[in-house]
Amino acid sequence: MAKQKFERTKPHVNVGTIGHVDHGKTTLTAAITSVLAGKGLATKRDYNQIDGAPEEKARGITINASHVEYETVNRHYAHVDCPGHADYVKNMITGAAQMDGAILVVSAADGPMPQTREHILLSRQVGVPKLVVFLNKADLVDDEELLDLVEMEVRELLSEYDFPGDDIPVIKGSALGALEGKPEWVAKVEELMDAVDAYIDTPLRATDKPFMMPVEDVFTITGRGTVATGRVDRGIVKVGDQVEIVGITDTKTTTVTGVEMFRKLLDQAEAGDNIGALLRGVDREGVERGQVLSKPGTVKPHAKFTAQIYVLSKEEGGRHTAFFSNYRPQFYFRTTDITGIITLGEGTEMVMPGDNAEVTVELIHPIALEEGTKFSIREGGRTVASGSVVKILAD
């Protein structure tokens, strides 16, 4: 049978491996590519290719991450694997690699460890919707009861962080065994990918979500009106659509009377397009950078929220000293800086460079916010921390 030509007709899903250091995340990533390559669905990547992760920058923070891609019969996957623990923390908080789901790797020989817990917590905080568990190194555990005990421990830990611990698929296997081509362990990696296929939901395509566009610039066209420019974050906007202008000032409703891209007029624009939207009855002062245009009723302005933040270390160009409650930096959301006040959680005296922490933030004026919205914290124009909105609080 001729090999099928690669077509982008399959739904695309972003996943990643998470878990404690040395529990086998990278070996499993290599094993997945190796097993799927045997079916003509991936290019085999060996451990060293994945482990030598290149540096990338996201929101002014350097992160090491390896990206591999592969397919199952049903889907096309992009898979991210990070070499160091700090890279995971940064990756998840900055959203450098959005994950629609993750494979939690736990060594059956060691059971859950501190970073296992931390990665589950981070997944919960930054909104990774679904986890699948791979109990690795099962070939090193002779006692079946011990394996069951570790599985129970992992399930309890997941439930502790509000994941459905009883329902999450747990596959016991050996990544190294699969990489070496041993049939019983190859079968376990196949079982894992079946679970990932079935349990991790296909994300809504960006174009199927309600329209939103952060405003980057505003200008006036004489005789025609005010144009707001920016990149459509999600959804579709058509000429004649009503939109709301949200954030900074009171929410206003207007109608899009024209959509322009590369100086050409369009009937509609969709997620990813850089456009200018002509707004009816809005003067030059009626819309500004930092606001968003959105489908009416879908986005609300908020000023107060809890957030998970990662504070850059001195070596990363961050602060040299700790900060305390009532710290007042600038919060950079989408296109604009806005001052806010940080309050630390009970029992936390201070936050040191290199830490990650949960904090409460109150902005000086409300802006369009949702759970999962990413932001940077800046001081004098340089990034000192990165964060993700965990929960909106009543103002």
From Swiss-Prot:
<dbReference type="InterPro" id="IPR009001">
    <property type="entry name" value="Transl_elong_EF1A/Init_IF2_C"/>
</dbReference>
<feature type="region of interest" description="G4">
    <location>
        <begin position="136"/>
        <end position="139"/>
    </location>
</feature>
<keyword id="KW-0378">Hydrolase</keyword>
<keyword id="KW-0547">Nucleotide-binding</keyword>
<dbReference type="InterPro" id="IPR033720">
    <property type="entry name" value="EFTU_2"/>
</dbReference>
<keyword id="KW-0963">Cytoplasm</keyword>
<keyword id="KW-0251">Elongation factor</keyword>
<dbReference type="InterPro" id="IPR050055">
    <property type="entry name" value="EF-Tu_GTPase"/>
</dbReference>
<feature type="region of interest" description="G5">
    <location>
        <begin position="174"/>
        <end position="176"/>
    </location>
</feature>
<dbReference type="InterPro" id="IPR041709">
    <property type="entry name" value="EF-Tu_GTP-bd"/>
</dbReference>
<feature type="region of interest" description="G1">
    <location>
        <begin position="19"/>
        <end position="26"/>
    </location>
</feature>
<feature type="binding site">
    <location>
        <position position="26"/>
    </location>
    <ligand>
        <name>Mg(2+)</name>
    </ligand>
</feature>
<comment type="function">
    <text>GTP hydrolase that promotes the GTP-dependent binding of aminoacyl-tRNA to the A-site of ribosomes during protein biosynthesis.</text>
</comment>
<feature type="binding site">
    <location>
        <begin position="19"/>
        <end position="26"/>
    </location>
    <ligand>
        <name>GTP</name>
    </ligand>
</feature>
<dbReference type="Pfam" id="PF00009">
    <property type="entry name" value="GTP_EFTU"/>
</dbReference>
<feature type="region of interest" description="G3">
    <location>
        <begin position="81"/>
        <end position="84"/>
    </location>
</feature>
<dbReference type="InterPro" id="IPR004541">
    <property type="entry name" value="Transl_elong_EFTu/EF1A_bac/org"/>
</dbReference>
<protein>
    <recommendedName>
        <fullName>Elongation factor Tu</fullName>
        <ecNumber>3.6.5.3</ecNumber>
    </recommendedName>
</protein>
<dbReference type="InterPro" id="IPR004161">
    <property type="entry name" value="EFTu-like_2"/>
</dbReference>
<dbReference type="GO" id="GO:0003746">
    <property type="term" value="F:translation elongation factor activity"/>
</dbReference>
<dbReference type="GO" id="GO:0005829">
    <property type="term" value="C:cytosol"/>
</dbReference>
<feature type="region of interest" description="G2">
    <location>
        <begin position="60"/>
        <end position="64"/>
    </location>
</feature>
<dbReference type="InterPro" id="IPR000795">
    <property type="entry name" value="T_Tr_GTP-bd_dom"/>
</dbReference>
<keyword id="KW-0342">GTP-binding</keyword>
<dbReference type="InterPro" id="IPR005225">
    <property type="entry name" value="Small_GTP-bd"/>
</dbReference>
<dbReference type="GO" id="GO:0003924">
    <property type="term" value="F:GTPase activity"/>
</dbReference>
<feature type="binding site">
    <location>
        <begin position="81"/>
        <end position="85"/>
    </location>
    <ligand>
        <name>GTP</name>
    </ligand>
</feature>
<keyword id="KW-0648">Protein biosynthesis</keyword>
<dbReference type="GO" id="GO:0005525">
    <property type="term" value="F:GTP binding"/>
</dbReference>
<keyword id="KW-0460">Magnesium</keyword>
<feature type="domain" description="tr-type G">
    <location>
        <begin position="10"/>
        <end position="204"/>
    </location>
</feature>
<keyword id="KW-0479">Metal-binding</keyword>
<dbReference type="Pfam" id="PF03143">
    <property type="entry name" value="GTP_EFTU_D3"/>
</dbReference>
<comment type="similarity">
    <text>Belongs to the TRAFAC class translation factor GTPase superfamily. Classic translation factor GTPase family. EF-Tu/EF-1A subfamily.</text>
</comment>
<dbReference type="Pfam" id="PF03144">
    <property type="entry name" value="GTP_EFTU_D2"/>
</dbReference>
<dbReference type="InterPro" id="IPR027417">
    <property type="entry name" value="P-loop_NTPase"/>
</dbReference>
<feature type="binding site">
    <location>
        <begin position="136"/>
        <end position="139"/>
    </location>
    <ligand>
        <name>GTP</name>
    </ligand>
</feature>
<dbReference type="InterPro" id="IPR009000">
    <property type="entry name" value="Transl_B-barrel_sf"/>
</dbReference>
<dbReference type="InterPro" id="IPR031157">
    <property type="entry name" value="G_TR_CS"/>
</dbReference>
<comment type="subunit">
    <text>Monomer.</text>
</comment>
<dbReference type="InterPro" id="IPR004160">
    <property type="entry name" value="Transl_elong_EFTu/EF1A_C"/>
</dbReference>
